[in-house]
């Protein structure tokens, strides 16, 4: 898709919530689909207030004037490059009764258009009902940000359900490492912070929060209520600062000068997000029961704020006692009760904070951009999936998970959990990722230091008999888990990592290659005794890579012996309809056919290649669907008699995507068939939202990766396995890009910010 979209909306520097929303949405679309969408803006102006608009604003419109609206319709029709028009609708933005002037524009438009209703009145009079219904009838699609609004459009306005799309208000995933340090920057050290944000007007109900603070401050003298934001420009033009002055007097009357503070400025996004990040309780006290959505409300939840809110539409859909409280309109007693409860219970606030984040991660702007692209494509009737751009291959979260000893196993959200200890599995994969990085980009001290740590950890795990232990605790001691678990797969992964490092000898220090060589050579005493299919496969991979370093008849014989064993396993398990090595598909499936293909490349035995191709084709038939990959669920393996394709939703882990991509790359290297490259593109897009939830699994803020997809949500933790497997998959896409297009000339430590997946 390479289309031009025109948004008709208020837009910065105009100061209003819809302008901010539109800017955030446009930025998200640009970031996610740069080069695939051309976006232009028709900015709604305020009469008598000329604004200095810059790109992407191409047009301006006085929407309060009927003739201007009609003229704009003709201007849009005359521009053949505009493919689709997107209108942000709110009562008051457009002139005439209930914005009737907009209907004049839309009725003349010969382009398909989408309209987003920011407010849907539940009990409209006949004039409102007619105008909104006509706008909806003319639109190709109608979007709303709450399910309640969608339901009202169907039942009251009689819009067809297939025309209505519910896309939630976007949110920012914002993290600060030191909350107290940011409080200090704002002069709030030692304070318990309650806050609210928005352009001030009487319908914000700020008096409710101020009155509640009288009781709150009695029990918590260090509590401060921040009222963030300037007075709404329209209010200032009409009456100056009379409303703010009344609030100041109310504060004085209640003796709250030390407990209520104004931040009277139009905050930048970064400043706003920092204020929200240090907020202990967010207060939303609007007195408008018909308000459908609030950007600041969802921004606060996304920042991890427990929320106390009046019962407007969005709050009733999103808030429950796991993340906040609903109160009646104008009820300062209820607000004070809940605030006192929360301020007095750190554990409750922490629990609500976590749940608020979980509830809003589906609506981060990257996911909202994906939903919009899917909508645009449905209107344009395009079958070819437009993939998001490749994110940067940064090592920030891998580094965050790594201390002086090695990579820690788990994280709580993005915070490493030292108590989880370390595993050989994770450090072996991390070593492979660092070696891949040095191949794709110039090696530097930062990357090599990480690689050294992971290699040293593998050496630490190697025992006197040259085998490896897997589990290490926070005190760097081997745990009892090593005695109760089958460690063959872990040992196989270590062989894979050591062999891969050796294969990259041209990019790595000789001392590292020699160190890996010694560890691997010592392991020759036991490798041939492996019996687990995946352990055999990992070992074959490592030995294949060893042969890229030096030729060795001993190693070729080892590969042949292991591949012959895997061949026998396959011959026993497979039949005419089940061409696999076991009676079910479980985990790390793709490594089995990949190992057989590598065995063919090492030995030349055609039978190995035949089994590799036959079994991988079978696996792909179960996991690849129409333009997306369905990961085998770890909650319920896919068994022989389970049907044509795996259908279980949830339990999908990032590791399966990475291992499949390794196999696709190997098969492309072996055969040159471009179909494997196309499947690589589709597989990688799972991380970027091309999955059953239509949500990103890669975290664009931390550069880590979430731990997987559940039935209806994304696991928010970002542990070692997920992050490293994503990183390996992302680095494989560097090779994909060079094979699909002209080789990149980039030699920086960090790759170009965007590469196209199309």
Where does each model-flagged region fall?
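Short acidic/histidine- and often glycine-rich active-site loop of Leloir-type glycosyltransferases
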Residues: 293, 312-326
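Glycan-recognition and catalytic cores of secretory/periplasmic carbohydrate-active enzymes
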Residues: 224, 252, 366-368, 374, ...
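Conserved acidic donor-binding segment of nucleotide-sugar-dependent glycosyltransferases
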Residues: 321, 325-332, 341-346
């Amino acid at each position: 898709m390479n289309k031009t979209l025109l948004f008709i909306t208020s837009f910065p520097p105009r100061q209003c919530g819809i302008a901010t929303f539109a800017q955030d949405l446009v930025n998200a679309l640009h970031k996610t689909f740069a080069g695939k969408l051309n976006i232009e803006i028709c900015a709604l102006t305020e009469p008598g207030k000329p604004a200095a608009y810059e790109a992407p604003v191409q047009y301006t419109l006085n929407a309060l004037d009927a003739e201007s609206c009609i003229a704009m319709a003709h201007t849009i029709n005359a521009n053949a490059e505009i493919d689709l028009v997107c209108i942000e609708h709110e009562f008051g933005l457009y002139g005439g009764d209930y914005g009737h002037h907009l209907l004049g524009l839309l009725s003349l438009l010969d382009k398909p258009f989408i309209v987003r209703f920011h407010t849907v009145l539940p009990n409209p009079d006949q004039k409102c009902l007619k105008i909104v219904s006509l706008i909806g009838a003319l639109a190709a699609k109608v979007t709303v940000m709450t399910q309640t609004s969608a339901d009202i459009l169907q039942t009251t306005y009689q819009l067809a359900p297939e025309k209505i799309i519910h896309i939630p208000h976007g949110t920012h995933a914002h993290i600060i490492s030191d909350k107290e340090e940011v409080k200090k920057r704002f002069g709030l050290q030692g304070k318990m912070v309650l806050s609210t944000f928005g352009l001030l007007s009487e319908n914000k109900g700020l008096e409710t929060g101020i009155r509640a603070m009288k009781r709150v401050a009695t029990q918590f003298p260090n509590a401060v209520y921040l009222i963030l934001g300037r007075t709404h420009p329209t209010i200032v033009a009409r009456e100056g600062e009379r409303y703010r002055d009344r609030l100041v007097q109310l504060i004085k009357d209640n003796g709250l000068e030390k407990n209520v503070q104004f931040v009277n400025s139009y905050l930048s996004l970064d400043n706003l997000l920092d204020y929200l990040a240090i907020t202990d309780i967010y207060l939303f006290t609007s007195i408008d029961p018909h308000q459908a959505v609030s950007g600041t409300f969802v921004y606060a939840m996304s920042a991890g704020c427990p929320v106390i809110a009046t019962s407007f539409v969005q709050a009733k859909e999103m808030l429950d006692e796991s993340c906040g409280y609903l109160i009646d309109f104008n009820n300062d007693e209820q607000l004070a009760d809940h605030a006192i409860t929360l301020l007095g219970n750190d554990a409750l606030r922490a629990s609500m904070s976590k749940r608020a984040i979980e509830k809003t991660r589906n609506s981060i702007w990257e996911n909202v951009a994906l939903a919009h692209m899917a909508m645009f494509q449905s209107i344009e009737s395009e079958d070819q999936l437009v993939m998001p751009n490749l994110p940067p291959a940064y090592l920030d979260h891998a580094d965050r998970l790594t201390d002086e000893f090695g990579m820690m196993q788990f994280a709580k959200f993005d915070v490493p959990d030292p108590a989880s200890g370390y595993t050989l599995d994770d450090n072996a994969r991390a070593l492979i990722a660092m070696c891949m990085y040095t191949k794709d980009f110039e090696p530097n001290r930062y990357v090599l230091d990480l690689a050294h740590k992971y290699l040293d950890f593998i050496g630490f795990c190697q025992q006197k008999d040259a085998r490896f232990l897997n589990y290490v605790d926070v005190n760097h001691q081997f745990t009892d888990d090593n005695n109760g678990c089958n460690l063959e797969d872990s040992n196989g992964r270590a062989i894979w990592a050591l062999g891969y490092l050796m294969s990259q000898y041209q990019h790595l220090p000789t001392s590292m290659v020699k160190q890996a060589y010694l560890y691997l050579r010592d392991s020759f005493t036991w490798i041939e005794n492996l019996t687990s299919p995946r352990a055999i496969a990992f070992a074959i991979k490592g030995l294949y890579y060893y042969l890229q370093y030096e030729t060795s008849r001993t190693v070729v014989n080892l590969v042949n012996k292991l591949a012959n064993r895997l061949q026998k396993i396959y011959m026993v398990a497979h039949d005419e309809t089940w061409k696999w090595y076991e009676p079910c598909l479980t985990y790390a499936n793709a490594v089995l056919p990949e190992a057989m293909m590598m065995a063919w490349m090492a030995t030349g035995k055609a039978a190995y290649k035949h089994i590799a191709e036959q079994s991988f084709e079978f696996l792909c038939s179960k996991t690849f669907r129409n333009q997306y990959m369905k990961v085998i669920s770890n909650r319920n393996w896919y068994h022989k008699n389970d049907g044509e394709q795996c259908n279980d939703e949830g339990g999908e882990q990032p590791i399966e995507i990475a291992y499949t991509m390794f196999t696709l790359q190997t098969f492309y290297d072996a055969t040159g068939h471009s179909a494997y490259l196309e499947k690589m593109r589709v597989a990688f897009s799972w991380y970027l939202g091309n999955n059953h939830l239509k949500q990103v699994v890669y975290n664009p803020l931390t550069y880590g990766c979430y731990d997987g997809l559940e039935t209806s949500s994304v696991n928010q933790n970002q542990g070692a396995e997920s992050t490293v497997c994503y990183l390996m998959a992302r680095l494989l896409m560097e090779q994909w890009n060079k094979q699909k297009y002209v080789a990149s000339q980039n030699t920086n430590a960090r790759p170009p910010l965007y590469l196209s997946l199309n």
